[in-house]
From Swiss-Prot:
Family in the record: To H.influenzae HI_1709.
Subcellular compartments: Periplasm
Organism: Escherichia coli (strain K12)
Protein name, UniProt field: Protein YgiW
Listed InterPro entries: BOBF_sf, BOF, Ca-regulated_OB-fold, YgiW/YdeI
Superkingdom of origin: Bacteria
Signal sequence coordinates: 1-20
Length: 130
Protein backbone atom coordinates (compact mmCIF):
# COMPACT_ATOMS: atom_id res chain seq x y z
CA UNK A 1 0.00 0.00 0.00
CA UNK A 2 2.87 2.39 0.82
CA UNK A 3 4.50 1.67 -2.54
CA UNK A 4 1.24 2.42 -4.32
CA UNK A 5 0.92 5.79 -2.52
CA UNK A 6 4.54 6.60 -3.35
CA UNK A 7 4.00 5.78 -7.05
CA UNK A 8 0.89 8.00 -7.15
CA UNK A 9 2.79 10.87 -5.48
CA UNK A 10 5.68 10.59 -7.97
CA UNK A 11 3.24 10.57 -10.90
CA UNK A 12 1.46 13.65 -9.56
CA UNK A 13 4.74 15.52 -9.15
CA UNK A 14 5.91 14.58 -12.64
CA UNK A 15 2.67 15.61 -14.32
CA UNK A 16 2.46 19.04 -12.66
CA UNK A 17 5.20 20.65 -14.82
CA UNK A 18 3.60 19.26 -17.98
CA UNK A 19 0.27 20.84 -17.08
CA UNK A 20 1.94 24.14 -16.22
CA UNK A 21 3.71 24.28 -19.60
CA UNK A 22 0.39 24.04 -21.41
CA UNK A 23 -1.00 27.09 -19.59
CA UNK A 24 1.93 29.47 -20.07
CA UNK A 25 5.58 29.88 -19.29
CA UNK A 26 8.59 29.67 -21.58
CA UNK A 27 7.88 28.31 -25.05
CA UNK A 28 11.03 29.08 -27.03
CA UNK A 29 14.01 31.38 -27.50
CA UNK A 30 11.97 34.08 -29.23
CA UNK A 31 9.42 34.34 -26.44
CA UNK A 32 11.31 36.89 -24.35
CA UNK A 33 9.22 39.69 -22.94
CA UNK A 34 10.49 43.07 -21.89
CA UNK A 35 9.68 43.57 -18.23
CA UNK A 36 10.59 46.90 -16.76
CA UNK A 37 10.36 47.21 -13.00
CA UNK A 38 9.32 50.12 -10.86
CA UNK A 39 7.13 53.14 -11.36
CA UNK A 40 7.07 54.93 -14.70
CA UNK A 41 5.62 58.41 -14.60
CA UNK A 42 6.19 61.89 -13.28
CA UNK A 43 8.01 62.38 -10.01
CA UNK A 44 6.34 64.11 -7.10
CA UNK A 45 6.39 67.85 -7.31
CA UNK A 46 9.06 69.90 -5.59
CA UNK A 47 7.77 72.12 -2.79
CA UNK A 48 9.20 75.53 -1.92
CA UNK A 49 10.40 76.41 1.56
CA UNK A 50 7.73 79.10 1.83
CA UNK A 51 4.90 76.66 1.12
CA UNK A 52 6.44 73.92 3.29
CA UNK A 53 6.23 76.22 6.30
CA UNK A 54 2.45 76.45 5.91
CA UNK A 55 1.83 72.71 5.47
CA UNK A 56 0.50 70.47 8.23
CA UNK A 57 2.69 68.46 10.58
CA UNK A 58 3.98 65.15 9.13
CA UNK A 59 3.30 66.21 5.52
CA UNK A 60 5.79 64.60 3.11
CA UNK A 61 7.74 67.19 1.08
CA UNK A 62 10.49 67.35 -1.52
CA UNK A 63 12.68 70.47 -1.48
CA UNK A 64 15.42 71.50 -3.91
CA UNK A 65 18.08 74.04 -2.96
CA UNK A 66 21.27 74.37 -0.90
CA UNK A 67 22.37 73.52 2.61
CA UNK A 68 24.11 76.72 3.61
CA UNK A 69 25.02 76.29 7.28
CA UNK A 70 25.39 73.73 10.05
CA UNK A 71 23.69 74.87 13.26
CA UNK A 72 24.34 71.85 15.49
CA UNK A 73 25.06 68.13 15.28
CA UNK A 74 22.12 67.17 13.03
CA UNK A 75 20.53 70.57 12.38
CA UNK A 76 21.26 72.56 9.20
CA UNK A 77 19.91 75.62 7.38
CA UNK A 78 18.39 74.83 3.97
CA UNK A 79 17.80 77.61 1.43
CA UNK A 80 15.90 77.83 -1.82
CA UNK A 81 14.65 80.79 -3.87
CA UNK A 82 11.68 81.36 -1.52
CA UNK A 83 13.48 81.36 1.84
CA UNK A 84 15.25 79.30 4.50
CA UNK A 85 14.19 76.53 6.86
CA UNK A 86 15.95 74.34 9.41
CA UNK A 87 16.39 70.71 8.39
CA UNK A 88 17.22 67.80 10.71
CA UNK A 89 19.49 65.30 8.94
CA UNK A 90 20.55 62.24 10.94
CA UNK A 91 24.03 60.87 10.24
CA UNK A 92 22.59 57.71 8.67
CA UNK A 93 20.68 59.75 6.05
CA UNK A 94 23.84 61.13 4.41
CA UNK A 95 24.75 57.75 2.84
CA UNK A 96 28.29 58.91 2.08
CA UNK A 97 27.18 62.04 0.20
CA UNK A 98 29.44 65.07 0.77
CA UNK A 99 27.70 68.41 0.28
CA UNK A 100 29.02 71.98 0.21
CA UNK A 101 26.95 75.19 0.23
CA UNK A 102 27.54 75.42 -3.55
CA UNK A 103 25.95 72.01 -4.23
CA UNK A 104 22.29 71.81 -5.20
CA UNK A 105 20.55 69.04 -3.28
CA UNK A 106 17.12 67.50 -3.21
CA UNK A 107 15.81 66.48 0.19
CA UNK A 108 12.75 64.45 1.00
CA UNK A 109 11.23 64.32 4.42
CA UNK A 110 8.40 65.27 6.74
CA UNK A 111 7.33 68.67 8.02
CA UNK A 112 7.93 68.74 11.78
CA UNK A 113 5.89 71.47 13.46
CA UNK A 114 6.30 72.40 17.09
CA UNK A 115 4.36 75.14 18.83
CA UNK A 116 6.87 77.82 17.78
CA UNK A 117 9.00 76.36 14.97
CA UNK A 118 8.88 74.44 11.71
CA UNK A 119 11.63 72.19 10.41
CA UNK A 120 12.01 69.30 8.00
CA UNK A 121 12.91 65.84 9.29
CA UNK A 122 14.98 64.61 6.33
CA UNK A 123 14.62 60.97 5.26
CA UNK A 124 16.63 61.14 2.01
CA UNK A 125 19.18 63.52 0.51
CA UNK A 126 20.87 63.49 -2.89
CA UNK A 127 22.90 65.85 -5.07
CA UNK A 128 21.24 67.08 -8.24
CA UNK A 129 22.42 69.07 -11.24
CA UNK A 130 21.32 72.72 -10.89
Amino acid sequence: MKKFAAVIAVMALCSAPVMAAEQGGFSGPSATQSQAGGFQGPNGSVTTVESAKSLRDDTWVTLRGNIVERISDDLYVFKDASGTINVDIDHKRWNGVTVTPKDTVEIQGEVDKDWNSVEIDVKQIRKVNP
